[in-house]
């Protein structure tokens, strides 16, 4: 029993159909052929009851090769009748799918990278950035509690030649620098209120000295020495400032008494204030300490003079 493939035929209008008559003829012919083959006989008079398998396989292979060769030109004819609009739509859909797959792969890579960075930060102990508080988080706990408002404001992209006049009700107020809340800053009052911090600084300096003495790491010791030197210089500057203010206060007190006696007021200049400050400073020193201070000052002045001299006049 032989089989044959049904091939579509393409007409001029592009519509394909199958030949039913040919199929029927082929089927009838195949049946008749089978009967002839079954009742066939050889030349020598001997009869046989079936086809030989080898001849049947060869016929099938030959028919398959012929049908493939016939289908190729038919497929090309069918493709030639496809409109350009259909081809363009197919091409767009292919490009869209390719872009979508690329964007998905890129998005997956970004999420994986972010997850790796977050895990690395957690392993190193780095705290994540604080996110901006939402409106629900900024709500007050009670109506008597102060309202919390974000200080972050977007910077305008437009250049403002003249600053706009903002009403007092809409102007932002920082309570740290608001005179209505804190009042006017007075350095004397501030120093008096926070004078207890000087005792804390003295304790810190003592602890630093002990740590420098016990430390065996040279790099750490140098860092602690720099910190201690900075604290000592700051304390010395504050003491000199307080001493200068004390000299000015005493001078003003004497001048007030002289004004009451009918004399004209005398106002100290900066140079006179420095002289009075040095005189009071040297009066508290003994002879040896005074000689050391004067010797240091002499050396300092000589070095300044040498720096101001031309190179040709500098000697040894």
From Swiss-Prot:
Keyword Nucleus: yes
Positions with biased composition (Basic and acidic residues): 94-110, 228-248
GO biological process: maturation of SSU-rRNA from tricistronic rRNA transcript (SSU-rRNA, 5.8S rRNA, LSU-rRNA)
Main location, first listed in the record: nucleus
Keywords: Coiled coil, Nucleus, Ribonucleoprotein, Ribosome biogenesis, rRNA processing
Domain of life per record: Eukaryota
Subcellular location per the Swiss-Prot or TrEMBL entry: Nucleus, Nucleolus
InterPro entries (alphabetical): RRP36
Keyword presence, Coiled coil: yes
UniProt feature coiled coil, ranges: 202-309
Family matches, as Pfam families: RRP36
Region spans: Disordered: 1-110, 131-158, 228-261, 293-316
Acidic residues: compositionally biased ranges: 52-71
GO cellular component, one term: 90S preribosome
Function: Component of the 90S pre-ribosome involved in the maturation of rRNAs. Required for early cleavages of the pre-RNAs in the 40S ribosomal subunit maturation pathway.
Entry's family note: Belongs to the RRP36 family.
Subunit structure: Associates with 90S and pre-40S pre-ribosomal particles.
Protein name: rRNA biogenesis protein RRP36
């Amino acid at each position: 029993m032989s089989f044959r493939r049904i091939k579509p035929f393409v007409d001029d209008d592009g519509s394909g159909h199958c030949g039913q008559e040919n199929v029927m003829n082929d089927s009838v012919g195949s049946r008749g052929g089978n009967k002839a083959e079954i009742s066939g006989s050889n030349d020598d008079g001997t009869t046989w009851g079936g086809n030989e398998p080898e001849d049947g396989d060869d016929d099938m292979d030959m028919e398959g090769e012929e049908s493939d060769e016939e289908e190729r030109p038919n497929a090309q004819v069918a493709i030639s009748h496809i409109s350009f609009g259909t081809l363009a739509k197919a091409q767009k859909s292919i490009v869209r799918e390719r872009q979508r797959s690329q964007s998905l792969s890129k998005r997956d890579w970004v999420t994986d990278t972010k997850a790796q960075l977050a895990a690395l930060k957690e392993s190193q102990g780095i705290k994540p950035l604080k996110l901006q508080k939402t409106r629900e988080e900024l709500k007050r706990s009670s109506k008597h509690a102060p309202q919390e408002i974000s200080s972050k404001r977007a910077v305008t992209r437009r250049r403002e030649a003249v600053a706009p006049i903002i009403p007092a009700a809409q102007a932002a107020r920082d309570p740290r620098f608001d005179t209505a809340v804190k009042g006017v800053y007075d350095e004397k009052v501030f120093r008096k209120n926070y004078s207890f911090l000087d005792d804390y600084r003295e304790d810190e300096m003592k602890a630093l000295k002990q740590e420098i003495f016990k430390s065996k790491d040279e790099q750490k010791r140098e860092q602690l020495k720099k910190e201690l030197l900075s604290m000592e210089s700051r304390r010395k500057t504050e003491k000199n400032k307080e001493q200068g203010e004390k000299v000015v206060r005493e001078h003003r007190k004497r001048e007030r008494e002289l004004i009451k006696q009918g004399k004209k007021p005398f106002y100290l200049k900066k140079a006179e204030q420095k002289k009075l400050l040095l005189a009071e400073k040297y009066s508290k020193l003994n002879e040896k300490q005074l000689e050391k201070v004067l010797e240091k000052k002499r050396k300092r002045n000589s070095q300044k003079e040498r720096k101001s001299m031309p190179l040709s006049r500098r000697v040894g």
